[in-house]
């Protein structure tokens, strides 16, 4: 029997936030698979999180919509492979199974075994999956063993990961990817503040970040105040970046965000997206 405690409660809460999206006045996406990975406890936690600190669930909702569009546009532009990196219960491989791209997943063994068990119970097949700690594994090589073509145009969705990772691990990992994958676009979310030193411009910024950590019951060791680090220390260019708060108008939720207190809006501005493209 798979020990779901090895997966972590956060994955179930994130799935529950997605599962509760139809309850919103203006839903941003439809994820019919999310309830498979939810339960009463996780849904209660998601509702409590939304009531106590709405920006935390707004972040998840906005990023889900953003990464959906990243995949859709990338496939339209010719990408033929999509890698879901550390995606937990991400079901985009099934949402976009008829879009003309091959999907692959990379995550910890406990996560993917549990996911495979749930999918099997629902008559759905897990896509080719590499069971690994991606920071330590040969990801391109491991995926190639599953039918992945490292030379083909590839999208990588790196959602909800960077802020949890040891800062010293990220550039070596990206350089390993770049050395084997010449046509790679990788999208991720991040906090645009220096979480390593915890030196913020103002005490208010620190308090905002700590508020998110408390809401998510997590600690974030890594942020990127300057995206040029990816261009200096790895062979990538920044193809796209911005704050999730700026997407509120596009998503039809500008009025909702405008009504947030100043602190909440400033918190959303710290949470950003970035797309890197192999040079």
Regions found by a protein language model. Name each.
Residues 1-83, 87-132, 150:
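Rossmann-like AdoMet
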Residues 180-194:
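Conserved beta-strand signature within the Rossmann-like core of class I S-adenosyl-L-methionine
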Residues 133-137:
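Conserved SAM/SAH-binding loop
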Residues 138-140, 164-177:
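A short, conserved alpha-helix within the catalytic core of class I
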């Amino acid at each position: 029997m798979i020990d779901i405690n090895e997966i972590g409660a956060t994955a179930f809460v994130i799935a529950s936030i997605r599962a509760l999206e139809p309850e919103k006045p203006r839903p941003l996406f439809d994820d019919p698979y999310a309830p498979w990975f939810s339960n009463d406890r996780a849904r209660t936690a998601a509702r409590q999180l939304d009531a106590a600190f709405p920006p935390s669930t707004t972040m998840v909702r906005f990023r889900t919509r953003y990464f959906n569009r990243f995949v859709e546009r990338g496939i339209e532009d010719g990408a033929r492979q999509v890698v879901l990196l550390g995606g937990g219960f991400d079901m985009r491989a099934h949402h976009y199974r008829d879009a003309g791209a091959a999907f692959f997943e990379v995550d910890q063994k406990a996560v993917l075994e549990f996911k495979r068990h749930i999918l099997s119970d629902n008559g759905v097949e897990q896509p080719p999956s590499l069971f690994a700690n991606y920071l330590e594994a040969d990801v391109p090589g491991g995926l190639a063993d599953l039918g992945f073509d490292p030379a083909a145009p590839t999208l990588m969705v790196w959602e909800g990961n960077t802020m949890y990772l040891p800062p010293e691990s990220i550039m070596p990992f990206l350089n390993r990817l770049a050395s084997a994958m010449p046509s790679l676009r990788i999208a991720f979310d991040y906090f645009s503040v220096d979480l390593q030193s915890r030196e913020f411009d103002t005490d208010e910024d620190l308090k905002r970040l700590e508020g998110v950590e408390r809401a998510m019951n997590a600690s974030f060791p890594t942020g990127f105040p300057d995206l040029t680090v990816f261009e200096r220390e790895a062979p990538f260019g920044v193809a796209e970046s911005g704050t999730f708060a700026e997407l509120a108008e596009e998503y039809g939720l500008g009025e909702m965000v405008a009504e947030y207190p100043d602190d909440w809006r400033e918190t959303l501005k710290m949470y950003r997206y970035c797309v890197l493209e192999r040079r």
